[in-house]
Amino acid sequence: LVCYGMTYLSISLMASAGHVRWFLAAYGFFACGQSCWIWALHRFHQLRPPYALLVVLPIVSVLGLSLDSISASLRVQLISSLFLGYEIWALYLLTLRRAEAMNRGTMVLIVGTLMFAAALLLRLHTPVVSLTLRDTAASTPPLLLSFVILSIAMHFKSTGFLMMCHERKQVLLDRMANVDVLTEL
């Protein structure tokens, strides 16, 4: 959540003189937030996180955006598809434990992840909907729609993850309350 907050802070500072630096910082923070999100899901499901893949996203997204040799719309499509791949990975992790009953937190988290993926698909198929083009006059309504979907999706994702953690804690507390202290049965 801190990385996502820093993303929006950096985007708001893009109006200053050195807006390219703030723009790259915003995408770097956003990519770090995505990597932390995947790491938290791995840790929640008690899986070993693949650290090499988690480090790739921030580095590749900032390097991809800093390349001026390719067109801006192609850069947006490449970075959006990379982020979309990480969201599909998150959906895989959320549906990994199909034997367990899906609780409300997991369902809210899946809805948030699907909304996030929808916003990325909007950017993938209409690359005009991005701040990388720096010509927002023609793309203001789709850009606003994309940011609204992203902010609502992040709210759903954070709320769902906190609900999942609370429900897991409640299950563990109920299990410990049913165990006899002396016999551990």
Predicted regions, residues:
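Juxtamembrane segments at transmembrane-helix boundaries
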Residues: 6-137, 144, 154, 160, ...
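Juxtamembrane helix-loop boundaries in multi-pass membrane proteins
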Residues: 1, 144-147
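Conserved nucleotide-binding and Mg2+-coordinating catalytic segments in signaling enzymes
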Residues: 174-185
